[in-house]
């Protein structure tokens, strides 16, 4: 069994992600962090899923059993956990969330003492410890060496200050009307608060979590409500977060969703014009639209590509000395202000762009033409090795010969195959997509 996917440990709560597994994962991670411990403290936060209570208690049990002290801060965005872990000088931070997934799923994400997500090599070390029963048994403490846990409810203020510091001091949102969809998730308190404190008039949607309604027909993956509300209330902008508020989808004043690659291009160019972009370029992923390449080139900037996942984006950013990158899906990293994707930091930079340029979102956030692109997610029974699927090489070669860019990969968190095609000829692209879907349905679900 493999524990870690593309973004921590994730699965259905109570079946894969049981209390027992959560406790053991926490013990394994704690054993790893103990070897490098400075403060003997680990921070634990969560989103608004009902199963978060079960998993949080299991994690606290596992960590205190091996002698760690635990600080519990309740529902907070994933980027807040990264920030507060470093701010409170903890050895590590743990976020309990399945991000954009529905309430049935949950997950466990780890951050080191600097607020960075763990590299794959560290995750592999933790997996080894997880499966080593003797190491787990030997690490358990007794008597006065057992750790303690305490809950702190006022750390939200630290994160709000950090968010406000990311917004230019010479600007105010006092003339802005904003619709915010909090996805009934971890950003339901901090999102409205920071926008209102910066002066905006905020219409808030889906900010009443009940443990089951997180991401339920709302948030970054379900934008119907925010789009309609922007038009209804004549708002300047719509902001849709996902369940743990590490990604954002922006809606213009006409109620139309802004493409994620367009957003990256607009923000990257804005930072370059202001002289705040470092490294001479931006980082995106292998799934980004080729139109973004053309736009960056026209601006005299480089576009570096990483594998999918904001952790991989950040690794390339560090390697190339770049402070801005992101994914088409809405994960945007501005490393001057955040160690991971941060939906609220990103939204504040969009608002700064609109105020500095005095432009409407519909114009400012669509600076280039996108190539026609289509992404289809195919549910699969098993994840066969792609290189071993008969006839696939020939199919991909045919796409190459006909000018169709392609990316085929399995989801790291779900039983799905993602097929992305891109071509200047939309009709050709759609025809080939129909063929590819039929091919994979037979190859993987027969």
Swiss-Prot record:
One GO term describing the cellular component: cytosol
SUPFAM superfamilies: Phosphoglucomutase, C-terminal domain, Phosphoglucomutase, first 3 domains
Annotated binding of Mg(2+), by residue: 99, 242, 244, 246
Note accompanying the cofactor annotation: Binds 1 Mg(2+) ion per subunit.
Keyword Methyltransferase: no
Family to which this protein belongs: Belongs to the phosphohexose mutase family.
Protein name, UniProt field: Phosphoglucosamine mutase
């Amino acid at each position: 069994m493999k524990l870690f996917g593309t973004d921590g440990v994730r699965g259905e709560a109570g079946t894969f992600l049981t209390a027992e597994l959560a406790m053991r994962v926490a013990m394994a991670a704690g054993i790893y962090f103990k070897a490098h411990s400075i403060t003997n403290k680990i921070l634990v936060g969560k989103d608004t899923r009902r199963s978060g209570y079960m998993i949080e208690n299991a994690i606290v049990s596992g960590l205190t059993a091996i002698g760690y002290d635990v600080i519990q801060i309740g529902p907070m965005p994933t980027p807040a956990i990264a920030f507060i872990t470093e701010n409170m000088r903890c050895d590590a931070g743990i976020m309990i969330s399945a991000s954009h997934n529905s309430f049935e799923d949950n997950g466990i994400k780890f951050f080191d003492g600097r607020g960075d997500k763990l590299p794959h090599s560290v995750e592999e070390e933790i997996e080894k410890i997880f499966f080593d029963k003797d190491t787990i048994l030997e690490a358990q403490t007794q008597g006065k060496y057992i750790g303690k846990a305490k809950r702190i409810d006022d750390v939200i203020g630290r994160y709000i200050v950090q968010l406000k510091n990311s917004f230019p001091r010479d600007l105010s949102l006092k003339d802005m009307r904003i619709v915010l969809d909090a996805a009934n998730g971890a950003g339901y308190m901090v999102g409205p608060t920071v926008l209102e404190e910066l002066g905006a008039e905020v219409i808030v949607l889906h900010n009443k979590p009940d443990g089951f309604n997180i991401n339920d027909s709302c948030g970054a993956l379900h934008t119907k409500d925010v789009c309609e509300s922007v038009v209804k209330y004549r708002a300047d902008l719509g902001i849709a977060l996902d369940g743990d508020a590490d990604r954002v989808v922006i809606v213009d004043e006409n109620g139309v969703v802004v493409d994620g690659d367009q957003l990256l291009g607009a923000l990257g160019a804005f930072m370059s014009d202001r002289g705040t972009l470092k490294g001479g370029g931006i980082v995106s992923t292998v799934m980004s639209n080729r139109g973004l390449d053309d736009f960056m080139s026209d601006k005299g900037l480089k576009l570096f590509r990483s594998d999918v996942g904001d952790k991989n984006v950040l690794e390339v950013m560090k390697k190339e000395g770049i402070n801005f990158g992101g994914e088409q899906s809405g994960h945007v990293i501005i490393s001057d202000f955040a160690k991971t994707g941060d939906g609220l930091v990103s939204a504040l930079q969009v608002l700064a762009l609109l105020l500095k340029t005095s432009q409407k979102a519909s114009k400012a956030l669509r600076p280039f033409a996108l190539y026609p692109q289509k992404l289809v997610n195919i549910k699969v029974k098993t994840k066969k090795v792609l290189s071993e699927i008969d006839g696939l090489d020939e199919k991909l070669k045919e796409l190459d010969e006909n000018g169709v860019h392609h990316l085929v990969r399995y989801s790291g968190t779900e039983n799905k195959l993602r097929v992305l095609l891109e071509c200047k000829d939309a009709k050709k692209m759609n025809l080939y997509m129909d063929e590819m879907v039929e091919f994979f349905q037979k190859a993987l679900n027969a």
